[in-house]
Amino acid sequence: MHNLFDLIIIGCGGVGSAAAYYAAERGLRVLALERFEAVHARGSSHGDTRVIRQAYFEHPDYVPLLKRAYALWEQLEQRISRQLFYPTGLVEVGPESGVLMQGVRQSAAMHQLPLAEIARGEFKDRFPGFVLPEDCVAVFESNAGFLLVEECIRHYIGEAQRLGADLRFNQPVRGWSVQRDEICITTDSEKFYAPRLVVAAGAWANEVLADLGLPLHVLRKHLHWYPVKTPTAYGLQNHSPTFFYETSAGYFYGFPVLNERGLKVAQHSGGTTVQDPLKVDRSVDVAELEQVDRFLRAHLPDVAIPATDHAVCMYTMTPDEHFIIDQHFVHPQIAIAAGLSGHGFKFASVLGESLVQLAIDGKTSIPLEFLSLRRFDCPSYRSGCTLRRDLG
């Protein structure tokens, strides 16, 4: 039966492409279905770069995952003989008692991670072009940096295909059903069957998994690129760091100048609700752009305003802004990644590996209980789920 597989994956973005690779590496017959073209710009994983860091202010329980993620990214680089991770270091700036500083220091202390306190007197010399506000302190995480987001996905796709995975693009899933030990996936043109399923549908998770009543909402987020006032300002070749600021106006982050697009910067906080991910407004949000401009004037004075390029991506948020990595309540042969809440791509390697383990083995090599869906009071957890889900 040519449409029978060991594992089917819904979604082939960052996490889905990694899952396809790690499933194929295990020798499984794997099919991945993606609603758009390969390495597209209509979801959450595009825009040149993504931050990767280990002293995780969000929660120290992420650190074991991050250590494995780093190892897997390095293995992928070795396999393809290409650099994907740029260890620029990360300068983090915020109030002494703020969420950022307290969280970073806690994770670094608990997991013995390198984290340098930057004295005010040395900040300007060490990080030219950056401003340390009077009410803030700074730390530097030397083993942090950024990933080339599209290149990571492109190479996971390519390596999965080289190992025999069947990856199909422009194939939105229209429905799925479970009959005894078999899962049937329906697209516009075909039906596919497998005993195991991974769902990594990004902003479409609530559509694909509507039976679970996941507590998710999607936000529209903006990425901006700016020219710089001098050719050497904030340049990757000049060892400029990746950066993250906590300010009274929210969280802002950015990257060294990587290419002709200029310096990329974005506001991590905020965002506007998306009702339909297929119809997201991709125009510039003028009010949000003004906030980014104000941040740059105050903290990166060698950036030339206005911005010259812009892109929109989506965050799929949970109520507590932590991931959902779990098995389906009724069908444990279905593994789910959802609600990565705007900080998930750095984990794509390890989440892909873990989802395959969860679907095939029923357990993961790294503890993920703190990301269980059971922490939420979901309708499906209270009353059970239907055995069929048809999508419009």
Descriptions of predicted regions:
Residues 2-15, 31:
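Beta1/beta-strand and adjacent pyrophosphate-binding region of the FAD-binding site
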Residues 20-25, 81-85, 191, 196, ...:
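Active-site substrate-recognition segment that forms the wall
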Residues 121-125, 146, 219, 286-364, ...:
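Flavin (FAD/FMN) cofactor-binding core of flavoprotein oxidoreductases
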Residues 49-126, 251:
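Dinucleotide-binding Rossmann-like beta1-alpha1 core, especially the glycine-rich loop
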Residues 24-45:
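Glycine-rich FAD pyrophosphate-binding loop
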Residues 3-5, 187-196:
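Core beta-strand elements of the Rossmann-like FAD/NAD(P) dinucleotide-binding domain
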Residues 75, 95-169, 175-181:
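Flavin (FAD/FMN) cofactor-binding and adjacent substrate-gating region
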